[in-house]
């Protein structure tokens, strides 16, 4: 299960599917193994979040998160996993209750803070989101929490504070990629951080690297769209965003709050594209 959970912290479809397969085997050996149920819930939920057209993943996550809580009602990880599923189901109030319970049980529980930060960002509550991403990063170094903390500050209009956090996010992404050189999501967040810091050519290089690693990944396409939008390459940005949505990216609330896409907001093609997107994943 530990090995499987190492894979579900990555976002490539193949890695997530491999992780889920390993965890399912652990459940077959011991159906009462609560940690395995938590791992299955997280992994299936991540598959649904990043690949929204995938059938059956959210249903599996729902079943596994419920079973994990039945087995370990005082497990912070089980409550966080349940909150994750509720978040993807659009049950925001219930999700927040689950995350709050997870944080009460474990002051250093990462996922509850990170995912609640995602909810707050989508709601436009950027200061709360920034604080939650900071707390998540204090619980465990994570390039996504660091990057989204910088983004939340950008959305607040705190340019200098955002720049300092992009520098920190870049360092975290670099350390992560020293150990995981084939992580395309980290490569795209590294690329956008570089662009935000004025290092445009380096940013483009890392965006190209991400596309080489996994050209079909929805999250990679989305973040490359962000990079093009930052460079005022509007049509290329919208092309990439269109490809991301076709590949399964389906989070309208996130797209509308993302400061990296601000230059696209008045474009009719962008508005038409976003109006047809739904879901909770990003």
Each predicted region: which residue ranges?
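Acidic, proline/glycine-rich low-complexity intrinsically disordered segments
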Residues: 1-156, 161-165, 169-175, 182, ...
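TPR/TPR-like (Sel1-like) alpha-helical repeat modules
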Residues: 166-170, 238-249, 278
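Hydrophobic, well-ordered secondary-structure elements that form the walls
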Residues: 191, 225, 237, 264, ...
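Sterile Alpha Motif
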Residues: 217-247
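Terminal, low-structured helical/coil segments at or just beyond the last alpha-helical repeat
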Residues: 253-282
């Amino acid at each position: 299960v530990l090995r499987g959970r190492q894979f579900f912290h990555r976002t490539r479809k193949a890695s997530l599917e491999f992780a889920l397969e390993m965890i399912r085997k652990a459940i077959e050996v011991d159906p009462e193994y609560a940690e395995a149920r938590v791992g299955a819930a997280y992994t299936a939920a991540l598959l649904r979040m990043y690949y929204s057209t995938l059938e059956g993943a959210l249903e599996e996550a729902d079943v596994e998160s419920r079973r994990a809580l039945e087995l370990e009602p005082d497990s912070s990880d089980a409550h966080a996993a349940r909150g994750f599923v509720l978040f993807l189901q659009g049950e925001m109030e219930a999700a927040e209750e689950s995350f709050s319970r997870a944080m009460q049980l474990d002051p250093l529980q990462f996922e509850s803070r990170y995912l609640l930060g995602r909810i707050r960002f989508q709601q436009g509550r950027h200061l709360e989101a920034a604080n939650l991403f900071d707390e998540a990063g204090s619980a465990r170094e994570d390039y996504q929490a660091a990057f989204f903390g910088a983004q939340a500050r950008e959305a607040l209009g705190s340019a200098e504070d955002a720049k300092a956090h992009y520098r920190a996010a870049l360092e975290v992404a670099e350390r992560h990629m020293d150990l995981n050189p084939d992580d395309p999501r980290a490569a795209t967040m590294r690329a956008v951080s570089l662009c935000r810091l004025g290092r445009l050519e380096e940013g483009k290089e890392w965006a190209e690297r991400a596309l080489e690693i996994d050209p079909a990944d929805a999250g990679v396409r989305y973040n490359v769209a962000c990079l093009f939008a930052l460079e005022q390459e509007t049509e290329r940005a919208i092309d990439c965003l269109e490809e991301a949505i076709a590949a399964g990216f389906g989070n309208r609330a996130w797209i509308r709050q993302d400061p990296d896409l601000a230059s696209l907001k008045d474009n009719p093609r962008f508005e038409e594209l976003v109006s047809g997107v739904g879901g909770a994943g990003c």
